[in-house]
Amino acid sequence: MKYISALTLLVMLAFAGNSILVRLALSTDCIGSLSFSIIRLLAGALVLALIAKPKQTLESGSWLSALYLLVYVLFFSYAYLSLDAGTGALILFAAVQIVMIGSGLWHGERLAALQWAGMTMACLGLFFLLRPGAASSPNLTGAVLMGLSGLGWALYSLRGRHAESPVLATAGNFAKASVYVVGVSIPLLFVLPEEYPSAKGIVLAIISGAITSGLGYTLWYKVLPNLPATRASIAQLSVPAIAAIGGMIFLNETVTTRLIITTALVLGGVAMATLWPSKQAA
């Protein structure tokens, strides 16, 4: 059990590490958002293909799942042009959970009163964070982009729930998303031109793709069968907090009282909504 707990902590550090790495790269102007996304997907695809075997990788995954993955990765990178690491991770996490809970409702799940209270609390927390006019409000464009990134990741996760081999499916989806990103890069560069990335930016993007994404997702799928659903959900609640602490240490970002209150409201609300058993519609 200690071994599983240690691996789970390592995976959560990897997930939070994606926020820190992209923010570190973009805040120092050593790489553009599109370049970071391209390298991240290519590096992730390469590592996952080596783990899953190249031939099987090309035959796995789906183009629709890959499109959702592309939406997540692209909007994630562009959102972090204007968001702190902790704030971005919190918005992403909240968006993912809200979409997934909404999907459950659409497919017949019924929420208990405590779950509705949790959803309300999480939404109030987001409103408190994003409400216009406050001095410490995050950039609205960045927040919207991160919300779209969360939508992409939620749809990707929902499609991958019943994959027979999650690692193989992820490898195939990363490979297909790499094809997509090359295709959209030319029109995007016309609209949002970027300078050539520096060596530092390239290295950070490779680490994000190969290690915190590729290896991180692989480890997560290895750990999941050994974790009860409640423990898996609780573990993921730690990611925004870890990202905020990492942003404070590595990026000199300020963790404000407002962010602390918002994080408590959102994570507490999501915990209430996801850890309490739902009912199926009769």
Regions found by a protein language model. Give the residues of each.
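C-terminal-most transmembrane helix of multi-pass membrane proteins
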Residues: 37, 41, 237-282
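Specific transmembrane alpha-helical segments of multi-pass solute transporters/efflux pumps
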Residues: 49, 55-93, 101, 121-128, ...
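Glycine-/small-residue-enriched transmembrane alpha-helix faces in small-molecule transporters
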Residues: 1-35, 67, 74-75, 124, ...
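Specific alpha-helical transmembrane segments that line the substrate/conduction pathway
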Residues: 35-43, 78-110, 149, 229-248
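Hydrophobic alpha-helical transmembrane segments of multi-pass integral membrane proteins
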Residues: 3-10, 34-50, 118-121, 141, ...
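Hydrophobic transmembrane alpha-helices of multi-pass small-molecule transport proteins
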Residues: 48, 69, 111-131, 150, ...
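C-terminal transmembrane-helix exit sites in multi-pass transporters
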Residues: 47-55, 78, 95-120, 127, ...
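Helix-helix packing/entry segments at the starts of transmembrane helices
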Residues: 88-95, 160-180, 210-249
